[in-house]
């Protein structure tokens, strides 16, 4: 296992200065190191920007924390102790990959590399020839801080000016033991917005030989769409920015830009066949792909490891990737998860098992499918119901065999009739919503239920459900599937929704997240 030892925050990334990158014998990983075609740019800055992309993923942590996981009982094992801790919403003691400690170090390490690049560009006088690199560094810095806030802070809401943030690193650190204040979540989001908006206008797509491993314009627009969706305002003015940036990615007719789910479903779920196709850089639906050191690829493989605290067949058939919906029964869904006789887990094959000394995982960070659902949600919040229904129709035609057009009335009627979820007795995708912002009963709420349902189906295994749970104040439960008992519950105001910062950071003097309601 790969263990990282971090101080209160990483200091200079000395290895990044020499362009150190992850290397693997796997074909996909061999393509990850930057092969930028230099166009009058500085080689060292270009190499340094490779390290501005984090080599960590929160997907395992987020999936374990969310309602996409159950305790299937002691008959089944778990891969590492942290899976048990994270599933039970405990403050994690372990420090290997996929833990909060690893994520903290990975994201701040990438931020340090971005800041070093920005400093080097500044020392050259910020020449126009380096604008693309400056833009890429700014967007990387914004993204990493955004992810840290998504992990270690509450969801952004009207109390953000009173909620703990995370340190926003804007300079190259030159002291051995600096002290940092966390500030507020409001301050973090404002700085993310500043860096993102400045950076996105500077990015150029012309300098990359493998663009899908970089923030191209479209990838940056997709990030902006998701960021503004999370940057929720009581009047939903943020949704105008979501629609704007998502439309820059998708245009007015997104159908041809979405993933070919039918073709993907025809590939074998064994080995890496389907998984490799899902993460292929040649796929137009993939806007940004990452290479990370993570066990999540192993847990999501056909090696059948660690199934105890995991997505199981009960969840699949009642709430997620084999559930019924507007499209009809699960027979209408193209993509089917991997499972086998006597095996409780139900696994969507979205990343293969790649071993290059460590276990590697290749997440798709941004895709056209997810960006489409960001726009559909923004339309629904703005009460632009026909436009939202049109985007939902585009999703349905791509993801299912049902090619019919959906109307707002049809969506409203379907989810209005659906019973609300209760553990064990009424297992449906429809859960009580208690967000900080106001949702109207009826049409608006039911279209949002639809979007939350199909996003959960589409992005299963990719960590997107946990932010939705936080944003919408969804009550979730820990269920023992053997005893048929609820062992814990997490209401909307539960302080554990802000995952605890690493212990060594707390010991070094940083304010921890509170733990008593």
Predicted regions and their residues:
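Sec-dependent bacterial lipoprotein signal peptides
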Residues: 1-24
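Aromatic-residue-lined binding/catalytic grooves and analogous aromatic/hydrophobic interfacial grooves
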Residues: 25-26, 218-259, 509-512, 516
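Membrane-proximal, proline-rich intrinsically disordered regions
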Residues: 25-72, 473-517
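Conserved, well-structured interaction surfaces
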Residues: 83-153, 179, 183-187, 196-208, ...
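Short coil/turn linking the two alpha-helices of tandem helical-hairpin repeats
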Residues: 149-156, 207, 230-236, 381-383
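Short coil/linker segments at helix-helix boundaries
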Residues: 151-191, 234-244
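Hydrophobic-face positions in mid-chain alpha helices that act as interaction patches
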Residues: 240-369, 402-438, 458-459, 463-464, ...
């Amino acid at each position: 296992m790969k263990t990282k030892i971090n101080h209160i925050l990483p200091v200079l990334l000395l290895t990044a200065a020499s362009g150190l990158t992850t290397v693997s014998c796997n074909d996909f990983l061999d393509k990850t190191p930057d092969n930028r075609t230099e166009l009058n740019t500085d080689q060292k800055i270009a190499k340094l920007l490779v390290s501005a992309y984090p080599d960590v993923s929160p997907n395992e942590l987020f999936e374990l924390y969310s309602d996409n996981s159950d305790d299937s009982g002691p008959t089944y094992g778990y891969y590492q102790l942290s899976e048990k801790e994270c599933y039970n919403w405990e403050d994690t003691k372990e420090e290997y990959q996929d833990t909060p400690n690893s994520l903290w170090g990975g994201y701040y390490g990438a931020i340090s590399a971005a800041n070093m690049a920005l400093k080097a560009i500044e020392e050259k006088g910020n020449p126009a020839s380096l604008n693309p690199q400056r833009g890429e560094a700014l967007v990387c810095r914004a993204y990493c801080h955004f992810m840290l806030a998504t992990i270690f802070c509450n969801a952004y809401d009207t109390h953000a000016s009173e909620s703990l943030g995370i340190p926003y690193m804007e300079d190259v650190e030159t002291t051995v033991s600096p002290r940092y204040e966390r500030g507020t979540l409001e301050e973090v989001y404002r700085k993310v917005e500043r860096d993102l908006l400045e950076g996105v206008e500077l990015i150029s797509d012309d300098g990359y030989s493998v663009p899908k491993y970089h923030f191209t314009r479209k990838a940056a627009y997709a990030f902006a769409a998701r960021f503004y969706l999370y940057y929720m305002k009581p009047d939903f003015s943020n949704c105008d920015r979501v629609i704007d940036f998502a439309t820059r990615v998708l245009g007015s007719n997104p159908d041809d830009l979405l993933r070919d789910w039918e073709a993907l479903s025809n590939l074998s779920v064994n080995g890496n066949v389907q998984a490799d196709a899902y993460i292929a850089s040649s796929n137009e639906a993939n806007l940004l792909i990452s290479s990370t050191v993570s066990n999540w690829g192993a847990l999501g493989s056909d090696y059948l490891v660690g199934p105890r605290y995991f997505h199981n067949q009960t969840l699949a058939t009642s709430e997620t990737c084999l559930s019924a919906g507007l499209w009809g029964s699960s027979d209408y869904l193209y993509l089917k998860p991997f499972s086998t006789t006597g095996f409780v887990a139900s696994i969507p094959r979205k990343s293969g098992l790649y071993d290059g000394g460590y276990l590697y995982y290749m997440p798709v960070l941004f895709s056209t499918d997810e960006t489409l659902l960001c726009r559909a949600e923004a339309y629904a919040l703005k009460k632009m119901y026909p436009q939202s229904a049109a985007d939902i129709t585009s999703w349905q035609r791509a993801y299912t065999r049902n090619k019919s057009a959906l109307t707002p009335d049809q969506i409203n009627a379907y989810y209005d009739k659906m019973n609300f979820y209760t553990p064990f007795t009424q297992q449906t995708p429809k859960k009580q919503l208690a967000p900080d912002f106001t949702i109207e009963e009826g049409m608006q709420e039911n279209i949002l239920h639809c979007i939350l349902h199909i996003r959960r189906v589409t992005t299963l295994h990719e960590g997107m459900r946990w932010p939705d749970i936080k944003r919408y104040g969804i009550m979730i439960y820990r269920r023992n599937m053997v005893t048929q008992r609820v062992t814990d519950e997490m209401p909307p105001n539960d302080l554990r929704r802000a995952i605890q910062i690493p212990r060594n950071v707390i010991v070094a003097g940083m304010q921890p997240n509170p733990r008593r309601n």
